[in-house]
Regions:
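Mixed-charge interfacial surface used for oligomerization/domain docking
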Residues: 2-3, 11-32, 83, 93, ...
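N-terminal glycine-rich anion-binding loop in soluble enzyme alpha/beta folds
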Residues: 4-70
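Non-transmembrane, interaction-prone segments in cytosolic or luminal domains
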Residues: 50-53, 59, 79, 209-210, ...
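Short, charged beta->alpha transition segments
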Residues: 69-76, 100-104
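Glycine-rich phosphate-binding loop signature in dinucleotide/nucleotide-binding domains
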Residues: 76-84
Length: 292
């Protein structure tokens, strides 16, 4: 039986406990402030918020580049001779990480590295990797065709649902994603956009919620749980640093009230926080297998 490794990027926001539990290898994306490139996940997230408060500018983000992937994959193969690697990439339409990993694999002629497009971000990637780990554990003792297993793992993308709500549009406006007029109206009416990850992996704004995070948490979570037929193993509770503790507690209460056996908090890291800012709230889940 060959050793199977799981790898991903820091934009997956996989909590440290799950990195250890699933033995995941993480390639850092990058956060750039005043021309200095920092590895995402290797510095306190408060630096992102402090930088914006001090300068009025949001840090920029950059993907893992092809050369970094080549070094990353070589290191894994050198340390684990004969291994098979399944790399779970941040949504290919939301970042160039996927295309850079694909180029690295093709240009360097790597064998036995299979690239999976999660078509998701942050907590959605976390949910994906957790479900993929379970599937790999079920298959690893008998698997003969690693490419076929990769196809099964890619098919999981149809069953991952992820949504989040920024607490403020300030960062989105600073990044040019929201007009000044829209920002002004949203502030006056206390509107917060729902950001959904669609089936292609695109982040799209759909409906709007009105009120504070405390006021909208129940409706947001219950709307999601009514819309999707979720597996009841684990509900992934996404949050940006700064979200009030009572809102965090209520997120978990709603999950348990709706029959989930467990919950997993996922704090958004530098990549998402550069766009969503402080105190965002989100949810991710694995849906049940449809039987036709």
């Amino acid at each position: 039986m060959r050793e199977i490794l799981i790898s991903t990027e820091s934009g997956s926001d996989l909590p440290d406990a799950l990195v250890r539990k699933y033995q995941v290898y993480v390639a850092p994306m990058h956060i750039i402030m005043d021309g200095e490139s920092l590895d995402d996940g290797c510095f306190p997230i408060d630096r992102v918020f402090d930088y914006f408060d001090e300068t009025g500018r949001i840090p920029t983000t950059s993907a893992v580049n092809e050369g970094e992937y080549i070094d990353f994959f070589h290191k894994l193969q050198d340390e684990h001779p004969g291994c098979v690697i399944y790399h779970f990439a941040y949504s290919s339409v939301a970042s160039s990480t996927y295309s850079h990993a694909k180029l690295a694999i093709e240009d360097e002629g790597f064998r036995d590295i299979y690239l999976i497009d999660t078509k998701s971000v942050s907590g959605g990637c976390t949910a994906y990797i957790a479900e993929a780990y379970k599937l790999i554990q079920e298959r690893k003792a008998t698997v003969m065709d690693y490419a076929a297993l990769a196809e099964e793992l890619q098919a999981l993308s149809d069953r991952i649902e992820c949504q989040f709500i920024p607490a403020t549009l300030t960062y989105l406006r600073a990044g040019g994603r929201v007009s000044n007029a829209s920002y002004l109206v949203a502030n006056i009416l206390n509107l917060k956009p729902l950001i959904e990850i669609n089936s292609d992996g695109r982040l799209i704004a759909t409906k709007k919620y009105r009120g504070s995070m405390r006021r909208i948490v129940d409706k947001f979570y219950k709307d999601f749980l009514r819309r999707y037929d979720c597996q009841k193993d684990t509900l992934y509770l996404m949050y940006g640093k700064g979200l009030a503790q009572d809102v965090l507690d209520r997120m978990r209460e709603i999950a348990l009230e709706n029959g989930f056996k467990d919950t997993q908090y996922v704090m958004t890291g530098g990549t998402i926080s550069c766009h969503g800012g402080k105190g965002a709230m989100g949810i991710a889940a694995v849906t049940r297998i449809s039987i036709v």
